[in-house]
Amino acid sequence: MTAKWIKQLRDKRIKDKYGYEIVLVNDGSFDGTNNSLKKIQEKNEHITVITHQQNMGLGQVLRTGITYIEKKANENDVLCIMDADNTHDPCYIHSMLNKMKETGAECIIASRYQKGSKIIGVSWFRNLMSYGARLLYTVSLGIPNVKDYTCGYRIYKMKKIKKAMALYGDQFISETGFTCMVEILYKLYVVGTTFNEIPFELRYDLKKGASKMKVLKNAIKSIDIAIHARRRYRY
């Protein structure tokens, strides 16, 4: 997947128009992953690898990556966050940047629930759970123009990330599991972020290895977040 990123990011449209840096957060994988990432980093000045010494979960991965980037980025930069397990194709970055420019939205989500989206390789049960969570968040949080509250493939304007981090400090991301994606979204909404979405194709069939998501535990946590987010995250 990293090789695919590099190939696409060397595309003249991005390199000449935007410039880029790739930050890879390795969450405690020492099965050869870290050595491979270091070799890639040595060959490309645009790549930074940060390694956790043990598996710490999605929330900490995002804290590590976003904190590192926030210190280097200026308010005019944009931040794209995506999974590196083959499920999120980098080809959508262009569409997301174009959508941001066209609409003026400050966060663009690659959505599983826009017309034209596809979900491939996900069991009917997980699809059902995801759809249920979507309805729950829509009713309880009601963020304008958002249909997909949990997909991690997003582009953010750094000025809003910086504003939220200034407000919440170390608690900008307090959730440890997959519900941190909802937390980030709502806290950005609190600081006035505007949102929009593009359709995309989630390729779960290309994911290597089993999912680390504990479905029942995540479902319970999703309900908790939906009920308490407005009180818990308001400022």
Go through the PLM ranges and name each one.
Residues I143:
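Hanks-type protein kinase catalytic core
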Residues A210-D224:
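Non-catalytic, C-terminal membrane-associated alpha-helical segments of glycosyltransferases
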Residues Y149-T150:
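An anion-binding catalytic pocket shared by soluble metabolic enzymes
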Residues R154-I155, K214:
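Short aromatic/basic micro-patch
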Residues M1-W124, L128-Y131, Y156-Y168, E175-I198, ...:
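Structured catalytic core of nucleotide-sugar glycosyltransferases
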Residues P199-M213:
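Active-site donor/metal-binding and catalytic loop motifs
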